């Protein structure tokens, strides 16, 4: 009788152990996520700013960020980097937060992510504050996420794709950036 009971307990343990392991609380740490503050500066007049802003506000980043979108008008934009910087400097009072760092004007403000497109000049770029900076290969991936939509003149969709892709990299620990 004792042997039978021991076999039954052992069998029951073997049957239930996968369930116990599956239900056991994991020590894996959950990473907090943050929804961005968003501003849209549609200088080219190609966006549905309200709808785009609403979509971007639902993204989840690993750090608190201010997500700024800028469209640059004109077919003569030869250097988008310069155009975005010029806009940031000349429109400082028009933006929700300063885009250029007040402590060091050679850098973008901390917590800032800028997604920019010059539709008529076929230029796209993304820019990051020092504390949310990503590797250049990730910048390329973020920009590439929008290319097919931009080819179709889906500016809102392309910018949402860039935003979604940026959530994959922004705030990721440096040791994980290549993943």
Short names for language-model regions:
Residues 1-114, 119-179:
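A structural boundary signal for the start of the first folded domain, especially the loop/turn
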